[in-house]
Amino acid sequence: TYVHCSPVMRDQHNKMSKRHGDPSYEDLKAQGYLTEAILNYVALLGWSPRGDQAEREVFSLQELAEVFDIAGISKSPAIFDIEKLTHFNALYLRAMSPEDFAKIAEPYIREAVKNPAVDAAAVAALLQARCEKLTDIPEKVDFFDALPDYGTDLFTNKKSKTNPEVSKAMLEAAIPALEGLGDWSQ
């Protein structure tokens, strides 16, 4: 059986094209998108599930094969929305087991954190709910190796009547309260 699918558009008037810099599968993978998220999103471009699956968006490849029905193919062109793909990717990242996420996140963590004493699995546990793409990871953890140099002007505010000496006293007073909070790992 031959089926014609509507084109995937970059915007309302232009088809996606590698000539115009639109991303390929390999480009999306390099940008930190998971294969499962890409497949799920692309499957829903120009097709929508029917019946009791009509409101559902997230499918495994096996589930897509089971629920696919040719009647769900749209005649209208579909517009590729990178924000929607990013949303799908974030859903897939958050749905992963902590162990699986740590395994795929470690190369991105090690890209920014060279200190071998830093536990990549512990860092991954903190990042899983905060990342939309794997390539977000290095910029979120680069401070582990080198803290930025903050000047004393950060502690000066005329409106709040603070200066470095007052700020130091306030921070010293806050230490006992913060120490009483216990676990800081989350």
Residue ranges with predicted function:
Residues 1-93, 106-107, 165, 186:
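Alpha-helical recognition segments enriched in aromatics with Gly/Pro capping
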Residues 98-186:
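Small-residue-rich helix-loop
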